[in-house]
Design a protein with these regions (language model features):
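Long, low-complexity intrinsically disordered regions in eukaryotic nuclear regulators
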Residues: 1-55
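Adenosine-phosphate binding glycine-rich loop
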Residues: 2, 19, 49-54, 61-70, ...
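Rossmann-fold NAD(P)-binding glycine/threonine-rich loop
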Residues: 16, 20, 27-30, 36-37, ...
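Glycine/serine-rich phosphate-binding loop and adjoining beta1-alpha1 elements at the start
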Residues: 61, 75-121, 152-290
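Glycine-rich phosphate/diphosphate-binding loop of Rossmann-like nucleotide-binding domains
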Residues: 129-148, 263-266, 270-355
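Residues in the short beta-alpha loop(s) of Rossmann-like NAD(P)-binding domains
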Residues: 156, 320-321, 378
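Rossmann-like NAD(P)-binding element
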Residues: 198, 202-205, 209, 331-388, ...
Length: 487
């Protein structure tokens, strides 16, 4: 989902710099909207690196760029005003971005073509809270093509592509999101998606659990009509399991994060490319010979390590899990404690989904020019809040890059940055009683179906089992071919 670091500005040798990048930021909020808090989050926090390369990403209307979207009166060409985006005039640019994304998302386009006539989501009213990027827009438009009505907001205050949000609003999707939301804006947008007259959701698609949390806290009666929750992230899945353990989960929930297609393709392969893309775009750093520590050796961490090692970086790992630590050792990486190596590192990357993985004390000890980058789900992995202190100075140096300057001159730049469709179809169409009030993994048959949708794009041809072979292996010829515990 919908990743980066930053160039050090040349200084005298005595001046220290640390570079900080946050690639897949997800905030943890505990406050709810207040009128006074609408602009409570400083604008000096930079935008997500999920920006497109195209002119659309840099398109702005200078006449109202500083105006909060909540204060604007906007309508699309059909006269609808049931949305709140940065600038509806960006829709044409966003449409180009979505069309480009469609070319690389053959599985969703194939699903759209195969199931469009059946309309398996006819009657579904889906409220979604995810990153709003061109890729997510392809998912949303697929859900609409399959019969669903959608209302959407962003799970991340930094990652929304404004032009894509405008394009979705232009075709009638009720979108409430823009890049650089304040904390109050974030909750206001979620509330506008859920609390609307004459429309009540019966499905939830969440990334991080904030939407689910908001509905539980403010509108628990909504769950009387909700058929299920689909959760995409490890953080959100963890929150669902906590609800289930406490006996408070009142609808079935589908854990998409742990599906094979999500784990391998989104978490491993996509992160393997996006880490380099983000770092290169913002720093032009040469990785050969750089000392890098990656915190966490899950699928995201594995992808980052593979990419960095291939470019000649010297990579070590921090891990709490002995199995993942052993995997790292067998893959040729040294397993260390962050406190042991923090002074020598050129790059620090967090991929855990936990909190306080990199503390203020460790930030203070980092060498000048160190790049600090979050590839995990939550921006609490790095103690950014502690950097908002009187003794530190924030300085905007260029678009998407702020320098945070220590009293001794040290500084770092700061930038904060689909199996889901099948899961929605499965939960929405499941007969009553199939799923109880618990958290479920995507059925392996559906996971394999998602994978099969991608294969034509690679001109891949599956070998078919003979009846004798299928009997010998104890498998159905049409699958599933892996047990449910396979990851």
């Amino acid at each position: 989902m919908p990743s980066a670091a930053f160039t050090a500005v040349p200084t005298l040798k005595s001046v220290k710099k640390i570079q900080f990048a946050n690639t897949e930021d997800k905030q943890e909020f505990s406050k709810y909207p207040t009128k006074a808090g609408r602009r409570s989050l400083s604008r000096s926090i930079s935008q997500s690196s999920t920006d497109s390369y195209s002119s659309a990403a840099s398109y702005t209307d200078s006449s109202d760029d500083e105006t909060s979207p909540r204060d604007k009166a906007q309508v699309n060409t059909n006269g609808s005003s049931d949305f709140c985006v940065k600038n509806i005039k960006q829709a044409e640019f966003g449409r180009r971005e979505i069309e480009i994304a469609e070319q690389d998302m053959s599985a969703l386009i194939s699903l759209r073509k195969r199931a469009q006539g059946e309309k398996p989501l006819s009657g579904a009213k889906i409220v979604g809270c995810t990153h709003i990027t061109a890729q997510t827009a392809v998912l949303i438009e697929t859900l609409v093509a399959l019969g669903a009505q959608c209302r959407w907001t962003a799970c991340n205050i930094y990652s929304t592509q404004n032009e894509v949000a405008a394009a979705l609003a232009e075709i009638g999707v009720s979108v409430f999101a823009w890049k650089g939301e304040s904390e109050d804006d974030f909750w206001w947008c979620i509330d506008r998606c859920v609390n609307t007259e004459g429309w009540q959701a019966n499905m939830i698609l969440d990334d991080g659990g904030d939407l689910t949390h908001w509905v539980y806290k403010k509108y628990p009666s909504v769950f009387k009509k909700v058929r299920g929750i689909v959760e995409e992230s490890v953080t959100g899945v963890h929150r669902l399991y906590q609800l289930s353990k406490a006996g408070k989960l009142c609808v079935p929930a589908m854990n998409v994060n742990d599906s094979v297609t999500k784990q391998k393709f989104d978490n491993l392969y996509c992160c393997r490319e996006s880490i380099l893309d983000g770092l290169k775009r913002t720093t032009d750093i040469m990785f050969g010979g750089k000392q890098v520590v990656v915190c966490g050796y899950g699928e995201v961490g594995k992808g980052c390590c593979t990419a960095l090692k291939a470019l000649g970086a010297i990579v070590c790992i921090t891990e709490i899990d002995p199995i993942c630590a052993l995997q790292a050792c067998m893959d040729g990486f040294r397993v260390v404690k962050l406190s042991e190596v923090i002074r020598q590192m050129d790059v620090v990357i967090t991929c855990t989904g936990n909190k306080n993985v990199v503390t203020r004390e460790q930030l203070d000890r980092m060498k000048n020019g160190c790049i600090v980058c979050n590839m995990g789900h939550s921006n609490t992995e790095i103690d950014v809040a502690s950097l908002r202190s009187p003794e530190l100075t924030w300085e905007r140096v260029r678009s998407q890059v702020d320098h945070i300057i220590w009293p001794d001159g040290k500084r770092f730049p700061l930038s904060l940055h689909h199996p889901a469709a099948l899961a929605l179809i499965e939960l929405f169409n499941a007969p009553e009683g199939r799923y109880k009030q618990d958290v479920y993994l995507l059925p392996k048959k559906m996971d394999e179906y998602v994978a099969s949708l991608h294969l034509p794009n690679f001109d891949a041809h599956l070998t078919e089992l003979s009846d004798e072979q299928a009997k010998y292996m104890g498998l159905n010829k049409n699958g599933p071919f892996k047990p449910n515990y396979y990851r």
